[in-house]
Curated annotation (Swiss-Prot):
Belongs to the bacterial ribosomal protein bL21 family. One of its GO terms (molecular function) is structural constituent of ribosome. It comes from Aquifex aeolicus (strain VF5). Keywords: Ribonucleoprotein, Ribosomal protein, RNA-binding, rRNA-binding. One of its GO terms (cellular component) is cytoplasm. It comes from the Bacteria. GO terms for biological process: translation. This is Large ribosomal subunit protein bL21. Part of the 50S ribosomal subunit. Contacts protein L20.
Amino acid sequence: MYAVIKTGGKQYKVEKGMKLKVEKLPYEVGQTVEFEALMLRKDDGSIEFNKGKVIAEVKAHGRGKKLIVFKYRPKKNYKRWKGHRQPYTEIEIKDILP
C-alpha cells in the first residue's frame, strides 16, 4: 500500500517504513505528525482519492547543502556573494490508515 501526501508545497509518494526529508515542520524530534492522503492505493489495486491518513514520526531537523548566490555587474566593480542552506525535517512513515 502506498499514499501520496502533500507538505511544504510538494507531493511525496510514501510507503510504510520509508524515511524522507521534507520542508521544515514545527514539531519536536520524536513527535508524531499526521498527514491527509491525497491518493491512497490499497494492496488489492483499488485507488481512493482524498481519503486516508498517514502517520509519521519526526526523526531529525537539519539544514541542506550550502548554495552560493553570486551577483555580478560587468565593468562596475560590483560583486555580491551570499550563501543559503535550506532547513528540512527528516520523517519516518509509521503507518498508512485507509
